[in-house]
Amino acid sequence: MAVPPGHGPFSGFPGPQEHTQVLPDVRLLPRRLPLAFRDATSAPLRKLSVDLIKTYKHINEVYYAKKKRRAQQAPPQDSSNKKEKKVLNHGYDDDNHDYIVRSGERWLERYEIDSLIGKGSFGQVVKAYDHQTQELVAIKIIKNKKAFLNQAQIELRLLELMNQHDTEMKYYIVHLKRHFMFRNHLCLVFELLSYNLYDLLRNTHFRGVSLNLTRKLAQQLCTALLFLATPELSIIHCDLKPENILLCNPKRSAIKIVDFGSSCQLGQRIYQYIQSRFYRSPEVLLGTPYDLAIDMWSLGCILVEMHTGEPLFSGSNEVDQMNRIVEVLGIPPAAMLDQAPKARKYFERLPGGGWTLRRTKELRKDYQGPGTRRLQEVLGVQTGGPGGRRAGEPGHSPADYLRFQDLVLRMLEYEPAARISPLGALQHGFFRRTADEATNTGPAGSSASTSPAPLDTCPSSSTASSISSSGGSSGSSSDNRTYRYSNRYCGGPGPPITDCEMNSPQVPPSQPLRPWAGGDVPHKTHQAPASASSLPGTGAQLPPQPRYLGRPPSPTSPPPPELMDVSLVGGPADCSPPHPAPAPQHPAASALRTRMTGGRPPLPPPDDPATLGPHLGLRGVPQSTAASS
C-alpha cells in the first residue's frame, strides 16, 4: 500500500525538495558565527572601568596624532588673510575694557605712572607720581564701560560729599584728591595708603592682634561709622571687611576705610546682594530692608577676627553662613523671620508658630545646633584669650574680655533697631580707662613712653605686602581674599614714639547706652549727631583722633602687631612725614606713602584732543545714574 507523502514514519525529515532549500542556510551558518570569542581585556565594560585611564590615554594619542597630521597637510596660511584682533578704544584698552597700563607714561603732563598695584571688577589701581605736588598717589582707573562709569559716578559723589564734611581728614575715611577723564576712563586720585588689616593678620600667622590694638582699631572704626551716620551723609558702606580697612603707616595704628564702590545713602538703596559673605548681616541674608546697622554687624565680625585671627562666621555659601550665625547666636527672633522674604531658605516654621533650622544637604556634618558655639569660648574669656595665647598678658584679664564680649554681642544683635549705634559703641565700657589699665600704662599725665622698641629694630618678615588706596569690589566679590594691591617700602629710623595707649572717652557709668534708631530716617529720641559739628573733635566728649610723628616706613612687610605703636594722640589722622618729601628722580626711587592737600582737577590741554578724553564735570551726579548699572 502506498503511503501518502508526508504521512510516513519519517515525515518529520525534509523531503528531497526541502533539503535543497535548507542546505544553503546551513552552509552560511559558520560565516555568521565568530571564529573565536573576543578577548576579555578588550570588552567595553573593562575599558570603561578598570582600564579607564588607558582608554583616555589611547583617545588622547589618537586625537593628537590626527591633529598633527592635519596640521602637516594644511597649506601655509597667508599672514595677510589672518583675522585682525579687535581694537578697543583706539588700542588703549584690553579685551576687558581695562586701560593698558604702561610704566613711565605721563598723564596730563602731571602724573607719571609707576606700576600697577591692584585690579578688581571696577578696573585697576596704579601708583603714580604727581609732579605738581611732588607726592606719590594712587589712581583708580574705572573700566571703559557705561555700567562701571555710572557706578563710579555714585562713588565719586559720595566721596566728594564726605570730603566736604571732613575737611581736616580726621574721621578715618580715604581722601579723594581729585578726578579727571583720561582716554575715556574715569580716574580717581587718592592718597596712597599702606597695608590692609588682612595683611596685618597674615603677618601674625592668623593668631590675631592684642586686645589693646583691637580696641584702637575699634575706636577709629566706630568714629568713622558715627561720621557716616550724620544726617547730612547717612551713608552705608555696604562692604566693610579687613581688606577695605587700611593702615596709614605700617608702624602706626591709624587706619582709613576705603572702597565706597558699593555704598549708598539711606533711602537710595540700589542692590540687594551686598556685603562680603563672612561679614553679611542677617537682614541682607533674609532679604529684608537694611540701613546703616549692617555696617555695625560687619564691624562686630571684624573685631572678633582681628583678635582671634579667624573669621567668626566663615560660611561657604549663604545657607552655611546663616547656619554658622545661628550656631553662635541662636535662632533669629520669630517677628523678624515672619517678615523675611527669604526666611524659608534657611528655616522651617514649627506648628506652634516658632521657627527651626531647615535641614538641607548643605547643612554641615559637624553642625552642633543653635547657640552651642558660645562667643565666650571663641574669645577665651576665662581661658586667657583665644587658645590661651594671651594668658597673663597685661590688658587681657577676664574683665577686659567680658567688656569686649559685651560690645561684640551688642554689635551682633539680630534686630537692626536693637543693634548698638556708633555713638553708643564709643560710650561702651570697653573704651573706658580702668584703674588696672592706668597701672599698666603709667600715670595719665606721664610723658614717658611705654611703647615697645622702635619698629626698625624688629626682625624683617618675608610676608608679601599688600596695599590699597581705594580699590576693591562690590559685595559680590570673592571671599577667597585676593590680594589686589602690593608694594614695598623704603626708609630709615625715625624719632622716638610717644605712647598714649589708653586715651578713650570718659563716660559716666550711669549713662545708658542708646540703641540704633533703625529705618531710613534718624529717630529724634536717639543719640544721633545733629550735624558734623557734634562729631569727635568739635565739642562732643568722644575719642580723640590720632596724630603721628613723622617716620618713614619700613622696607619690609607689615611689622608684628605687638611692636606697632598703638598710640592715639589728639589730632587728625596724619599719614605724612614731618616735611614735604623732595621730588625723586623717578617714582620708583621712593615708595614713601604720604598725604597731600587736595585741589581741583586740572583741565586737559586743549591742543591734544586725540590723546585726552573730554574733561568730565562729575560734581553733583544725580542718583538716577545708578539705574542703568
Curated annotation (Swiss-Prot):
CDD domains: PKc_DYRK1. It comes from the Eukaryota. Residues 552-562, 575-585 have a biased composition (Pro residues). Residues 111-431 form the Protein kinase domain. The active site is at D239 (proton acceptor). The modification Phosphoserine is found at S262, S624. Inhibited by RANBP9. Residues 67-89, 380-399, 436-629 are annotated as: Disordered. GO terms for biological process: adipose tissue development; DNA repair; myoblast fusion; positive regulation of DNA-templated transcription; protein phosphorylation. Residues 480-520 are annotated as: Interaction with RANBP9. One of its GO terms (molecular function) is protein kinase activity. It is an enzyme of class 2 (transferase). The modification Phosphotyrosine is found at Y63, Y92, Y111, Y129, Y171, Y271, Y273, Y401. ATP binds at I117, G118, K119, G120, S121, F122, G123, Q124, V125, K140, F190, E191, L192, L193. Dimer. Interacts with DCOHM, MAP2K3/MKK3, RANBP9 and TCF1/HNF1A. Part of a complex consisting of RANBP9, RAN, DYRK1B and COPS5. Interacts with DCAF7. Interacts with RNF169. This is Dual specificity tyrosine-phosphorylation-regulated kinase 1B. It comes from Homo sapiens.
